[in-house]
């Protein structure tokens, strides 16, 4: 019986939350769009300034950055080194592809502006702090 309660039907609190969200006015969602567009633009401008090639998301809150120039065969290893040496967290892009893709990492930009600015300041020095492989 407990199994039925956990797997059949949506939980009542989640249904109430969904109704609340559906009743928000258009201005709320327009404000969210403006906020996240602004954060995206800030982050992409910083990546551009740091010379880090990247995708331009059209609706997602993350960006894929190309790490090919660093020579790592493993995006996981690169992410570990990036966190340790540069102090910036990223997710290996290979986590999101069926194919063997190891030259992309994913950054999440739905953060406080101050957090993004701090990360971008660190990424400005990525070529000095993250060792290159195979050179």
What feature does the model see in each segment?
Residues 1-135:
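PLP-dependent class I/II
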């Amino acid at each position: 019986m407990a199994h039925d309660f956990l797997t059949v039907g949506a939980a009542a609190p989640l249904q109430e939350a969904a109704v609340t969200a559906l009743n928000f006015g258009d201005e709320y969602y327009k404000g969210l769009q403006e906020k996240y567009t602004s954060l995206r633009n800030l982050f992409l401008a910083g990546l551009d300034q740091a010379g880090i090639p990247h995708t331009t998301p059209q609706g997602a809150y993350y960006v894929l950055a190309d790490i090919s120039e660093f020579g790592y065969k493993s995006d996981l290893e690169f992410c570990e080194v990036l966190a340790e040496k540069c102090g910036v967290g990223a997710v290996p892009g290979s986590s999101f592809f069926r194919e063997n893709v190891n030259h992309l990492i994913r950054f999440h930009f739905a953060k406080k502006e101050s957090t993004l600015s701090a990360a971008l300041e660190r990424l400005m020095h990525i070529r000095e702090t993250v060792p290159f492989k195979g050179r």
